[in-house]
Amino acid sequence: MAMTSAATGFILTANVPAAIGGGSSKSTTIVSFLPMRSFGSRLVVRAAEDTPPATASSDSSSTTAAAAPAKVPAAKAKPPPIGPKRGSKVKILRKESYWYKNVGSVVAVDQDPKTRYPVVVRFAKVNYANISTNNYALDEVEEVK
C-alpha cells in the first residue's frame, strides 16, 4: 500500500483461530474503510462462518422437516383504536389549559396504552407562547358532534 493511501484509508482483517476456544468452528471477519473523497468510496463488511459438513442422518431429517408444512401462527386481531379519530373536533376539559372549554381538532392519537397524553389537538387560536397545539389525556378531551 502506498504511503499516500495509507493516510487516507485502512483495511482491518481479523482471523480468530479455533484453537483459542477449543471449538472446531472457524469464523472470518473482514472490515475495510476506504477514503471518502473518491466517488467509488464504499464500506465492505464480510463475515463468514464455516459449519461442519452434514452427515447422512441429519441430511435426511432436514429434508423431512422441509417437506412438512410450516405452521404459521395465527395473527392477532387488532385492538380497537384508542381515543377520538383523527380530524374530529374535541372540547378540552383540563382546567389549567389555556384552551379550557374551547374546541380544537385532533391531529394524531398515539395508540400505545402506556402514553400519558396520547391525543394531540390543534387550535385556531394561539396561546401566549404562540403555540397552537397541545397533548391531552383521554379523559381530558370530549368529542363534539
UniProtKB/Swiss-Prot annotation:
Domain of life: Eukaryota
Transit peptide: 1-46
Membrane topology: Peripheral membrane protein
An example Gene Ontology biological process: photosynthesis
InterPro entries: Elect_transpt_acc-like_dom_sf (IPR008990), PSI_PsaE (IPR003375)
GO molecular function: protein domain specific binding
Job of this protein: Stabilizes the interaction between PsaC and the PSI core, assists the docking of the ferredoxin to PSI and interacts with ferredoxin-NADP oxidoreductase.
Similarity section: Belongs to the PsaE family.
Protein name: Photosystem I reaction center subunit IV B, chloroplastic
Biological source species: Arabidopsis thaliana (Mouse-ear cress)
Gene name in the database record: PSAE2
